Structures are given as structure tokens and as C-alpha cells.
Amino acid sequence: YKKAGDYITTNGMFWNLDNHKMAEECLDVYTYDSYPSFAFGLNRDPKTAKDLNDRHWSKNLTEVRSICPHFAIMEQQSGAGGWTTRMEGPAPRPGQLTLWAMQSVAHGADYISFFRWRTCTFSTEMYWHGILDYDNRDNRKLAEVKDFYNKLKCLDEVCGADYTAAFGVLKDYDNMWDTNVDVWHRRVEAQSSEEIFIASEIYHTPYNTLYLNEDTD
């Protein structure tokens, strides 16, 4: 059913398959959902320094960039979150909508789509707030999206630029999939990757994740 001008994508990473191969063989561009306020959910302690709060989302964006250096954001968070069953999360504070969108851009996103235009009044995702709230009126989030757009226009000269990393973290899918069944390996891998990320954030040292395969030079 694909017509001229259509493109195929997805909106997330899947830990039980080779995302790099999927992107190469099945997709025109790789997209991801960015919800940094997961760091502030009811099940998280926002005062825990080790969590790095919303900065921690850049760890996910680094993984996405390893799959597609110039990716897209299918759903960029614009409001409070939560299904009717879980994932309760607060609304972005003034300025955070722009901060989080710029976080995606800084990590290589060439396209940003905010979730969503207006908040739904029913169904499972009725607590996932969009740019407009239930009253469908202009608000500070809409003003901030407009301001974000104006800020982006100032970045025209660097649009399409490649992300420059100071070091790389090597991975491969066989070892990553092994963590799904090997509890010892899972705990060691989680702690190791977390400490590498924390060090890079504290010392402002950018890094890339590189997945090795049979075709790696």
C-alpha cells in the first residue's frame, strides 16, 4: 500500500530484536518517543542525584543515534503523562518542554513531533496531556512550542550536522540479549553502563554507542 512519497518508520526501541538490522532492511528512517518526565514519576525519587532526573533520557537518545545518526522523534513529550493503569507523571515545568525538545535535537534528531495536539477526554491515554489541555484553549505550552520553533530557526547553520563524540562504548546484540536470561550479566551490564553514563554527564564528555556485527570493519 506504500505510495510515492510515503515512508516507513516505527516509534521505539525493541530489546528482543536487532534494531540496526530492522532499520537497514525495513525502515526509511528510525523514530523514537521521548518522555524525559519518566524520571519524575510517582515511582521515582526526583531528589536522588544518581538518577540525573530528566538528563538521564539522553542515555536512550544515545542508543537511538547508534541505530540512525539522524533520527526523528515521533512523540516528544509536551504535557503530563499517564495511562489509566500506570505511568503517572507530572507536567513539564515552564521551559522544560523546550529543554527536552532541544535535548533531542542536540542528540541528532532532525525531526520533532510533539505528542499531542490536544488532550483526549476518554480512553486509555486520556491522562497523556498534549500541547492543548482538555479545554482546547491556547496556553503556555502552545506559546513554548512556538518559541521552540523560533529558536530552531537560529540553528539553521548546524542543521544536519553529525554528533561528535569523545569516546565510544562497544556493544553487540548477542551479549545484550544474554542479559535477558542471565541475571548476573544483567546486573553487571546495568551497573556498568549506568556508571559510564553518569561519568560522561558529570564531566560533559559526549559518547556514542557502537554495535559490533559480522560486517564491522
Q: How should these model regions be labeled?
A:
Residues Y1-D6, Y35-D217:
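Carbohydrate-binding surfaces of carbohydrate-active enzymes
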Residues T10, Y30, G168-L170:
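Short, well-ordered beta-strand segments
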Residues N11-M13, Y211:
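Short loop/edge segments at beta-strand edges and connector loops
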Residues N16-E25:
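Distinct, well-ordered alpha-helical segments
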Residues E25-Y30, G108:
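Glycine-enriched alpha-helix->loop->beta-strand junction motifs that scaffold or abut catalytic
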